[in-house]
């Protein structure tokens, strides 16, 4: 008997447009948490757990910022520094509105994972404080900085993308009206 297919947008990686990208993204998101939580079961070396967790967090940050965000939801961001003034600002990039169709499953996985991970790290910070294991707080602080930075940047990037799409459609609509008006005026003077 054939099993029913999951509905589009449901949390099934099989519906993903980019399953390898999605699974790698989720693997990086989960691996740093797993090493932090269960690393002491395999080794008593706190420094090794610290280093492995930091490396996994850095890989997650890079992969999310440069690969997964672009492929899964069509968004990318980076920080630019003006060499003459030294001012830095964030630059947001989104795919063209008609050029890429965003898969609902990819989008749901992406946004759930991007907002859930900082919440997990906040919970782990609370656990570290209340269990008096302050040695873990620097690691949790680094994890929070990296995950919250990506969360904020992609949230702003998404808002920028939506605003650009609205402005672009209004601008294109204005061009259409302008071209119709200029054609009508042009015809009037050529007669």
UniProtKB/Swiss-Prot annotation:
InterPro entries found in the cross-reference section: TVP23-like
Signal sequence residues: none
GO biological process, one term: vesicle-mediated transport
Entry-listed glycosylation sites: 103
Gene Ontology, cellular component aspect: Golgi membrane
Membrane topology: Multi-pass membrane protein
TM annotation in the entry: 15-35, 37-57, 109-129, 134-154
Keywords: Glycoprotein, Golgi apparatus, Membrane, Transmembrane, Transmembrane helix
Subcellular location: Golgi apparatus membrane
Pfam families: DUF846 (PF05832)
Main location: Golgi
Similarity comment: Belongs to the TVP23 family.
Function in brief: Golgi membrane protein involved in vesicular trafficking.
PANTHER family, A to Z: GOLGI APPARATUS MEMBRANE PROTEIN TVP23 (PTHR13019:SF7)
Name of the protein in its database record: Golgi apparatus membrane protein TVP23
Gene assigned in the entry: TVP23
């Amino acid at each position: 008997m054939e099993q029913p297919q999951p509905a589009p947008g449901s949390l099934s990686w099989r519906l993903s447009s980019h399953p390898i990208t999605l699974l790698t993204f989720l693997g990086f998101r989960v691996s740093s948490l797993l090493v932090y939580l269960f690393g002491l079961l395999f080794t008593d070396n706190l420094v090794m757990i610290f280093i492995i967790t930091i490396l996994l967090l850095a890989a997650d940050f890079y992969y999310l910022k440069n690969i997964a965000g672009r492929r899964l939801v069509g968004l990318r961001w980076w920080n630019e520094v003006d060499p003459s003034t030294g001012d830095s600002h964030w630059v947001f990039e989104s795919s063209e509105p008609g050029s890429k169709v965003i898969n609902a499953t990819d989008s749901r996985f992406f946004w759930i994972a991007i907002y859930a991970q900082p919440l997990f790290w906040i919970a782990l910070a609370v656990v570290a404080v209340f269990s008096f294991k302050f040695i873990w707080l620097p690691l949790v602080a680094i994890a929070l900085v990296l995950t919250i930075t990506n969360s904020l940047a992609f949230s702003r990037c998404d808002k920028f993308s939506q605003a650009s799409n609205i402005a672009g459609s209004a601008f294109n609509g204005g061009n259409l009206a302008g071209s119709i008006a200029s054609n009508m005026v042009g015809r009037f003077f050529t007669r």
